[in-house]
Regions:
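Conserved N-terminal phosphate-binding loop of PLP-dependent enzymes in the Aspartate aminotransferase
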Residues: 1-446
């Protein structure tokens, strides 16, 4: 693990001169469509700190978008991946297999919800996992329709763009998209017209009615939902919504898929967010936090469903790369040894407490319309004071002020008005509180 000191340090403006030089090179060489939240160039990272090429140390509240949950240089990940690199980097599992792939699939069978027989297939990215979950569901059901939800995000490939709700920046100008994708309402409690207390029952009834009347349940291969909606704004579907949708799927022979790409692997204080309401999905897609920063994803599910695709129908040249598999085994080892579920719950306790204080005590605290999320997947929704009108400008201004003071935060949400917090689960509590201090000071600049 990197021995980077776990303390914030600013020695230049953000970004510094060396980052500015690299940014000029980037503009000349990298496609303009590849964005960056903060143009500081990383030299090393670990724990809750990112150190840039100018020697600035930033507090990390982003984890590379929920990827480096165990830190960006966790000892077990580095040790296992380094050993694998020394042995071999690639054979292609479909040509000559290797134990690491099998062992990752065994760990996934142990960790994912349910005590039924399970199997997995490994890929490279979250979007690949979602695409393959659709392929598997279609092979199993012999149906074609796929149901997704308002505010959902599932990736940037053609099919997953079609499954994603938000247009800009993910979809604009990139169509037409794959057919047989249908979108229905989700129980967004903060914005549900009759109140959060009614959202679960009413939204599930409305979604089921739309599926039944507009698509036909007998035509649906899969229902796919994030148990905590990520890019859509860290929306927790109101209680009762997920169980109702899962039961409807079960009653109608539809494969229920939990997209846990952002919420999985201890991020919400449980191995998987769907466990909160006792959901046992037919298939579960994972990526991001699975491998400590290395590119790996998976589809895991009921053995009889996973086996529906014909031999050779699943896979890919790089899928389940041996170095990434070694990283995943190191990440899971770290999660278990350090009780990162427990650490995520403590992060929630600290963050929600501090955010509630800001909401109630700051002169402009009513700009925080909602505080939500679980574990180390927490967000605030920013609104025009006294209303629920989304305030994307405030979210952007807060993020910019935090960046200038050495705190990396990210925005999200269909309306662009959500500030999200995804600190590494190994972040120290002093560093966590210092980051929240910076956020509180940033509010004073609004």
């Amino acid at each position: 693990m990197s021995d980077i000191p776990q303390e914030r340090r600013l020695v230049t403006a953000i970004p510094g001169p060396k980052s500015a030089e690299l940014q000029a090179r980037r503009v000349a060489a990298v496609a303009a469509g590849v964005g960056s939240t903060l143009p500081v160039f990383t030299a090393r990272a670990g724990g809750g700190i990112i150190e840039d090429v100018d020697g600035n140390r930033l507090i990390d509240f982003g984890s590379g978008i929920a990827v480096t949950s165990v830190g960006a240089s966790a000892e077990a990940v580095v040790r296992r991946a380094s050993a694998q690199l020394a042995d071999f980097t690639h054979t292609c599992f479909m040509v000559t297999p290797y134990e690491g792939y099998v062992e990752v699939c065994e760990r996934l069978a142990e960790l994912t919800p349910g005590d039924h027989a399970k199997k997995s297939a490994l890929f490279n990215s979250g979007a690949e996992a979602v695409e393959n979950a659709v392929k598997i569901a279609r092979a199993y059901t012999k149906r074609t329709a796929v149901v997704v939800f308002d505010h959902g995000y599932h990736g940037r490939t053609n099919l997953t763009m079609g499954m994603t709700a938000k247009n800009m920046p993910y979809k604009q100008g990139f169509g037409p998209f794959a057919p047989e994708v249908y979108r229905v309402p989700v129980a967004y409690g903060y914005r549900w017209p009759t109140g959060a207390e009614n959202a679960g029952a009413e939204a599930s009834a409305q979604a089921i009615d739309e599926i039944t009347k507009q698509i036909g349940a007998e035509n649906v291969a899969a229902v796919i939902i994030e148990p905590v909606l990520g890019e859509g704004g860290f929306i927790e579907p109101a209680k009762g919504f997920l169980p109702a949708i899962a039961q409807f799927a079960k009653d109608n022979g539809i494969v229920f898929v939990a997209d846990e790409i952002q919420s999985g692997f201890c991020r919400t204080g449980q191995w998987f967010a769907c466990e909160d309401e006792g959901i046992v999905p037919d298939l579960i897609t994972t990526a991001k936090g699975i491998a400590g920063g290395l590119p790996l994803s998976a589809v895991t599910g009921r053995a009889e469903i996973m086996d529906a695709a014909h031999a050779g129908g699943l896979g890919g040249t790089y899928g389940g790369n041996p170095v990434a598999c070694a990283g995943a085994l190191g990440a899971i080892e770290t999660m278990r040894e350090l009780d990162l579920n427990g650490k995520a719950k403590r992060i929630e306790e600290v963050m929600k407490g501090r955010l509630a204080e800001m909401q109630s005590k700051l002169p402009n605290g009513d700009a925080i319309g909602d505080i939500r999320g679980r574990g180390a997947m927490i967000a605030i929704e920013l609104v025009k004071p006294g209303t629920k009108e989304p305030d994307a400008a405030a979210a952007g201004a807060l993020a910019k002020a935090c960046h200038a003071e050495g705190l990396l935060v990210l925005t999200c949400g269909t309306y662009g008005n959500v500030l999200r917090f995804l600190p590494p689960l190994v972040i120290g509590e002093d560093l966590l509180n210092e980051g929240l201090d910076i956020l509180e000071r940033a509010f004073a600049q609004l």
